[in-house]
Amino acid sequence: MAPITVKRFGRRGILAAAGAVSSGAITGFPTVWAQNIKNVTLRQFGTGVSNLNAVAEKVKQDLGFTLTMTALDTDAVTQKAVTQPKSYDIADIEYFAIKKVFPTGVMQPMDAKKIKNADKIVPIFTKGKLSPDSAMAQGTTPYSVGFVDGPAGKTFAHGQTGWMTLIPTIYNADTLGIRPDLVGRPIGNWKDLVDPAFKGKASILNIPSIGIMDAAMVMESIGTLKYADKGNMTKPEIDKTIAFLIEAKKAGQFRAFWKTFDESVNLMASGEVIIQSMWSPAVAAVRSKGIPCKYQPLAEGYRAWAGGLGIAKHLSGLELDAAYEYINWYLSGWVGAYLNRQGYYSAVLETAKQFMSPDEWGFWIEGKPAASDILSPEGKVMEKAGAVRDGGSFTERMGKVACWNSVMNEDRYMIQKWNEFIAA
């Protein structure tokens, strides 16, 4: 079992444990390299969503070296990446955070030619949208911060190059979670979050850069405000959004403001909250308790997020080779299937499919009714036979992204105003 240091501070939570699918080790290394790599330890840190014990254990089994992991919340990840660049080798970081981190020079651009499945990465990351017909979403799109011009680049390129800031690994489309047995009526819009009918039974997440995006989706849904770019608000737009939230708070609309996966699960499972900002695996966690919970598709579309693996600037030699091998292994299918089974999406769907049953693939990716019970990576029943994934297929869900999690130009001002809302 690989040594692992996991400090839990929330951020999309973990459904840890190894899946039943086996994976062949990547081979073809020189013998000396294969022997030496056993002595390598790579230190990875990032958000809890993909800092998984099962991945560290599988790395040891398949690649032979040791991967240690530390899980932090989003803000702590960004701070550590910039202020403690020698304390990690691999950063598992979200794309909207890389907008802050990469220009500081603490990470090195990655050579796309060394990534075996680079040409199979979902076009959201390599072309900016899912299909040629898809609309460009607002916010910090992964494509806009995904490339730099060269091996020493710090400035984001306007388009695809051979040098990547992160290798994408995980992403999803977020919406509202509801208790269909308690809301008492159909839910179809973001504005339903602030319907007075749910006074004292609603919740919004207290991560400023994400919570304010949910608030913006609500305000546009109501028709109160039309943003030029929800992901890059002006000061007047921030002021109006926060004033709206404070008014709703003072009216008693919100039961709580959650920061962690477990908090969101407990609020919904207890019935204290019946409509809230939520993450897909948290909905699944509520359902696993036998409690009705739905990840509700909404007319205005989804708010999306994505993360990837980046390499620290100081990494070189055998450790750098090991990092590239790890990233190639990550995209080779086993991890992708594991993440897909949690309700996320993998960056290379083609390889993940090889590690999923036709029924799993049909349910999670194609939006088909489950032919048999759908199991989580640890073997628990997540959905009963006949169930259909909320929101449908991969194309239906990721094709309806309205905005991406973002870092605004007025980020500091936004956080200051958000804190005023929480304190109000």
Task: Please give the residue ranges for each predicted region.
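N-terminal secretory signal peptides
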Residues: 1-9, 22-23
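Mature extracytoplasmic/periplasmic domains
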Residues: 34, 312-389
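Early extracytoplasmic/lumenal segment of secretory-pathway proteins
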Residues: 35-104
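Extracytoplasmic ligand-binding site segments that recognize negatively charged/polar headgroups
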Residues: 50, 102-263
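Alpha-to-beta junction loops
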Residues: 84-92, 106-108, 198-200, 270-275
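Extracytoplasmic/periplasmic substrate-binding proteins
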Residues: 253-316, 353-356, 360
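Conserved C-terminal helix/tail region of periplasmic/extracytoplasmic solute-binding proteins
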Residues: 378-424
